[in-house]
Design a protein with these regions (language model features):
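Extracellular glycan-modifying ectodomains
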Residues: 1-397
């Protein structure tokens, strides 16, 4: 009789200890969420979710409850660790069940959680222009109005559009292509000889330009984009060429892999070295030497990498000054695709201004008004560039 009693007592003790740990972790998560929320979700490389302010309006509309649920998923201790373990196990299952089929039939597109996998490349579903028609029209008309207002103050300034096609423009299963470029150029009212694009007309085009697991272009795609943009702008001097390409690149997993929880699906991160002219770089007004740390990479000082780590994150304003006043000043108005070509473009100009309208006001403390910015900085050339997200996101309005 004594043995069963001891086992029963031990069982109750273990149950009580487990319940205590669960309650302790939950309470610590609630306290952390309410009073000391962390700013960054390091596992997913994004800003951590935080709860909205508790107000009657937020509570009745459900905004507070939804934000609290998302915040707890980020703030509770060990949440990222458990998510990582879960994603690793899920990836192993995915690799065991689906990847062999994908490898046997590279011409087919296999779908998982909104992402397609074709010949080893993760691809998004092509954009449905009808779903974003109002935002795209509003943004195109706003930019057309901005250029008209700018011409009244700065009649000498030239305006260009350079569009970067992606998997959101081309359906690899049906070989159908969206005419996003035509829609944008028509509604922004930029003359045809001032517009250009980097085309994706088939899977082979896409594979040359983009990462397997990320929505950004790789260094080869960025270089082709740079060449295309310089041709559009009529730059006649010799373009920069890579002097070295990484023979032993670091491996990483990009945004698409993170989107479906497959951080273990890694690929090489190719890097090209260029001989840039001397330039001073300012990020949101502060001097910086963190864009494209070529020496650190090629000397082996970097042990991990991502698109943002190497080319820079989302910044409201980046200025690259080569101190050659006899040359023109250029303004790039785009998104994070610009990050990989800023220094290449800057090599041909006096000052290169790169503005991301999504975060400019927050980072610089004032709204972005094109006419005033062009006048203040003596801009000669304005380029609207990017993929479809730069022309369909309400954050740019």
């Amino acid at each position: 009789m004594l043995l069963p009693m001891k086992e029963s007592k031990r069982k109750r003790y273990c149950q009580g200890l487990f319940a205590f740990l669960v309650i302790a972790i939950t309470l610590s998560g609630l306290l952390r969420t309410a009073f000391w929320p962390k700013d960054v979700n390091t596992y997913e490389s994004r800003n951590a979710n935080k709860p909205e302010a508790f107000t009657v309006g937020n509570y009745l509309s459900g905004v507070f409850q939804d934000s609290m649920e998302k915040a707890l998923a980020d703030q509770v201790p060990f949440a990222q660790y458990f998510k990582k373990v879960f994603n690793i196990l899920r990836f192993q299952y995915y690799r065991f069940m689906l990847l062999p089929k994908a490898e046997q039939h590279p011409e087919l597109c296999f779908h998982y959680k909104g992402i397609g996998l074709i010949d080893g490349y993760m691809v998004h579903k092509p954009a449905d222009l009808s779903e974003n028609i109002e935002i795209m029209l509003s943004l195109a008309h706003k930019r057309a109005d901005d250029m008209r207002a700018c011409r009244e103050i700065n009649p000498e300034t030239e305006y260009y559009l350079f569009y970067i096609e992606s998997d959101r423009d081309y359906d690899f299963e049906t070989a159908e292509k969206k005419d996003t470029y035509g829609f944008i150029t028509e509604n922004m009212e930029i003359p045809a000889d001032r517009t250009g694009r980097l085309c994706v007309d088939n899977l082979e085009d896409y594979k040359k330009i983009y990462f397997k697991t990320d929505h950004h272009w790789n260094c080869y795609g960025a270089y082709e984009g740079y060449r295309g943009l310089m041709t559009l702008l009529g730059v006649e001097e010799k373009l920069l060429e890579p002097v070295e390409t990484a023979s032993d690149p670091l491996w990483w997993a990009g945004s698409k892999a993170a989107e479906v929880g497959f951080r273990e699906y890694k690929e090489p991160f190719p890097i090209c070295r260029y001989e840039y002219p001397p330039m001073e770089i300012f990020i949101n007004g502060s001097p910086s030497d963190m864009l494209e740390p070529q020496e650190a990479f090629f000397s082996g000082e970097m042990d991990s990498i991502s698109y943002g780590d190497y080319y820079g994150g989302i910044e409201g304003e980046v200025i690259l000054d080569t101190n050659r006043p006899e040359r023109k000043n250029i303004l790039l108005l785009g998104d994070s695709f610009d990050n990989a070509i800023r220094k290449l473009v800057a090599s041909h100009f006096n000052k290169t201004f790169s503005v991301d309208e999504r975060t400019y006001e927050e980072d610089r403390g004032e709204p972005f008004i094109l006419a005033e910015y062009v006048r203040k900085n003596d801009i000669d050339i304005v380029v609207y560039d990017g993929d479809i997200l730069a022309f369909s996101g309400d954050a740019f309005l």
